[in-house]
């Protein structure tokens, strides 16, 4: 799974399991056209039967007769007998998340779309059951020092990389986004689909943009939620995005009467807490309850604060957690951070695939001494990724991968105004590059991933369902007006009266 100091940096969801072997072996001559036989299957948390199948693809596109891998595909069938010919294909985030494992949440998210359109889920190569590149390092009851120790995680990654490279499909250069999107179009062909509606979330937006770059004629509509274009350099962007999201927490608290009365010096307490590190702390483990003493560093603190910022609901607990930490009580902060990371069990990401993508597509473009060093979060993520990617095999990329050509089909881009991972500035750049076919909606008081919030589900449905392209674009603005009323959750207040809760205003001690 993804190392613990990186969990929470990438979009995740509720996880389901899908069984099935993955084969990788010398293959017979490839057929002239891909074939994909579907059979009835049951997916966890999906109420109706789905249809599942496997499409064989070459591991190395340059060697079509060489080692083959199996791409696992699931189709959630439309309810109506007369279904629309253009299904929805959902591209999961990460990088490293299985789309099929999210079948339950996706079926709930796209309930209206499923009335008349199939929803297609493909486990991208390296994820789920499609030549999985997983690292078996999930031990929820590890000590806190082990859980947040970057050096220890680097050793785990090195061992995992060595193991993965021994797999029959262990050429880690063959898991880049451009290759994966060629796989996706092979699935489209095998299903006999002329055009489809492409929906991507977080890293899935990068993949969707790459799919459109390679196969523009095959896209009917596109929805991008939490936009992470190829030129974003993911490890470097998090510090500035997280800083802006944290400042928004403090600003909102200062403007809210109850929050300000309870936490009048929240920002100062945070700064004092940072200034007190590194320091030895004693914390009860959130899962075992056993007290543990370890040295808390700024990097560890940042890794705990970042995950709650993804959702304003969890971020609303940060003023209380910071107050208690400034008083020497770190249980709330540790519990909040680890809970947002997946409860110590990760977010279901295939670590090997994650690094095969980031090490090839992002790390070579990282520049030292960037804006991250000026933030409270620092450049620890950059340094960790540089070290992890130092010996990781890197796939080749076409120069055009980092470009966004004008869109031929309507594109809806969605951003959360306080998203620490994919702030709206990136979607705005992409919208300008896509041209007049693109519409960008920024949802106030929202974090990473907004498509499932309130009226946004209906906005997406109407955008996809409208037969006329011009009308689909024109009505989005009016439909999305409901998003302007999205409230920010109020700050979590302690059980004690404000005067007692805020008695310690002098910072860390």
Q: Across the structure, where does each feature detected by a protein language model lie?
A:
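Short helix-capping/linker segments at secondary-structure and domain boundaries
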Residues: 309-327, 364-369, 397, 468
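Bacterial N-terminal signal peptides that target proteins for export
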Residues: 1-13
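Structural motif
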Residues: 285-303, 310-314, 344-352
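Long, low-complexity segments enriched in small/aliphatic residues
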Residues: 322, 327-367
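Gly/Pro-rich cap/lid or specificity-loop segments adjacent to the active site
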Residues: 27-300, 356-509
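Helix-loop "lid/cap" segments that line or gate small-molecule binding pockets
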Residues: 307-308, 360
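N-terminal signal peptide c-region/cleavage motif recognized by signal peptidases
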Residues: 19-21
